[in-house]
A protein has these predicted regions:
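N-terminal "arm"/small-domain region of PLP-dependent enzymes with the aminotransferase-like
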Residues: 1-53, 59-62
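Conserved C-terminal alpha-helix-loop-beta "cap" of PLP-dependent enzymes
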Residues: 274-359, 363
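Structural motif
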Residues: 67, 93, 270, 317-318
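PLP-dependent enzyme catalytic core of the Aspartate aminotransferase-like
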Residues: 103, 110, 119-121, 251, ...
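Conserved N-terminal alpha-helix of the aminotransferase class I/II PLP-enzyme fold
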Residues: 34-83, 87-88, 104-111
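Conserved PLP-enzyme active-site core in the AAT-like
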Residues: 17-18, 72-271, 276, 287, ...
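A common structural junction motif
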Residues: 229-230, 317-327, 378-387
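Glycine-rich beta-alpha junction loops
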Residues: 14-16, 31-37, 176, 198, ...
Length: 392
């Protein structure tokens, strides 16, 4: 019988049995660099922690199970994972990438991968004729869904039909929804990317990245690359992510409930010109989300009427933290222009809809009313400061 996802977050069925690891309920941290060999040509299965480590291996099995993949690889950061993916390609290869991506991914593609001879077509995969951009050198399509920060939603299954028709890889960054709400491999993706720092870890206390696949040939290539480049996740960080995953479902559900309430509240404010949350029926990707995901997540973006209003909000929040990153238990508000997308050329930012009045919100698990009370206070103070009285 198939176990539920909350159970999968806690228990790895293949390792169940009485008193494994001396009966420890919490999986041990194998804080070691190397391992003793019983004799020449014999091994315990572990030789050197750059190659593999029991704590990291246990985490990888959990993540692979959650994404319904055959293998998962844990990296020191999300960007380390994406960097390694790019090692699958050679000079002259062509990739189609979503126009709206995390700024760090854009920086990698524009300033590192391009210099290594890889060519990119940057398009809106959620609305353009993707197939028309495929050429004889195209090797993969790379997307986020929802995208960061504009929350565009792409039909993964529809895109997978194109990649299968042309023998391309489909690489999907699933960070914003986590495996709790969405499983791209089941929809036809070949590789799933995660910044484990975010929802999987969930506590803003460690960095991690993951690649998950359901193809043995890809797994073999990625395993060789991670062992060769030395970008695997350390034992203690692996344990922190394991601990975070245990409460993934509880956190995702609570944060999503809060996100719905905040999105609805923002829509009532005259100073807010646009609320972008895929859980709202007016979002262009709402129906696709209902089809391919089990939830809408807790990430939202909103546009304010002016840069001055946006900066004032950022300066006045207290319980809500003005900080980069996302997916933790605390609510974080981010200014893409100077933070996550600071290295993205202004022309590209504006083309994607990111302005100096754009704010991104990662909703946490606080009591929703406390979050709303803080926003009410911050908006009122900003309106008093800018307009001399309440506006919305």
């Amino acid at each position: 019988m198939e176990r539920g996802i909350n159970t999968k977050c806690l228990h790895l069925e293949e390792e169940e049995g009485c008193c494994n690891n001396y009966g420890s309920i919490s999986f041990p941290i194998y804080q070691t660099a190397t391992y003793e060999h019983p004799a020449v040509g014999q091994s315990t299965g572990f030789d050197y922690s750059r190659l593999q480590n029991p704590t990291r291996e246990h985490l990888e099995k959990i993540v692979a199970t959650l994404e319904n993949g055959i293998d998962a690889l844990a990296f020191s950061t999300g960007m380390a994972a994406i960097t390694l993916v790019m090692e699958l390609f050679k000079p002259g290869d062509h990739l189609i990438i979503d126009a709206d991506l995390y700024g760090g991914s854009i920086r990698l593609f524009d300033n590192v991968s391009s210099k290594n001879g890889i060519h990119f077509s940057r398009i809106d995969c959620w609305k353009e004729n993707v197939e028309s951009y495929v050429n004889e050198n195209t090797k993969a399509i790379y997307i986020e869904t929802p995208t960061n920060p504009m929350m565009n939603v792409t039909d993964i299954a529809a895109l997978a039909e194109i990649t299968k028709r042309h023998n391309l890889l489909l690489i999907v960054d699933n960070t914003f929804l986590s495996p709790y709400f969405q499983n791209p491999l089941e929809l036809g993706a070949d590789i799933v990317v995660h910044s484990g720092t975010k929802f999987l870890g969930g506590h803003n206390d460690t960095l991690a990245g993951f690649l998950v696949t359901n193809r043995a040939d890809i797994s073999e290539k990625l395993r060789f690359l991670i062992k060769t480049t030395g970008s695997g996740l350390a034992p203690f960080d692996s344990w922190l992510i394991l601990r975070g995953i245990k409460t993934l479902g509880i956190r995702m559900e609570q944060a999503q409930k809060n996100a719905f309430k905040i999105a609805e509240w923002l829509k009532t404010k005259s100073a807010v010109t646009r609320v972008i949350y895929p859980g709202l029926p007016d979002h262009p990707g709402y129906e696709i989300m209902k089809k391919q995901a089990r939830g809408f997540g807790s990430m939202l973006t909103f546009q304010l009427e002016s840069k001055e209003f946006a900066l004032s909000v950022l300066e006045k929040v207290r319980m809500i933290k003005f900080a980069e990153s996302l997916g933790g238990v605390e609510t974080l508000i981010t200014y893409p222009t100077t933070q996550t997308h600071a290295d993205v050329p202004k022309k590209i930012r504006e083309r994607n809809g990111i302005t100096e009045a754009t704010l991104r919100l990662s909703v946490g698990i606080e009591d929703a009313q406390d979050l709303l009370d803080e926003f009410e206070k911050v908006f009122a103070e900003t309106e008093e400061e800018l307009y001399g009285g309440k506006k919305s």
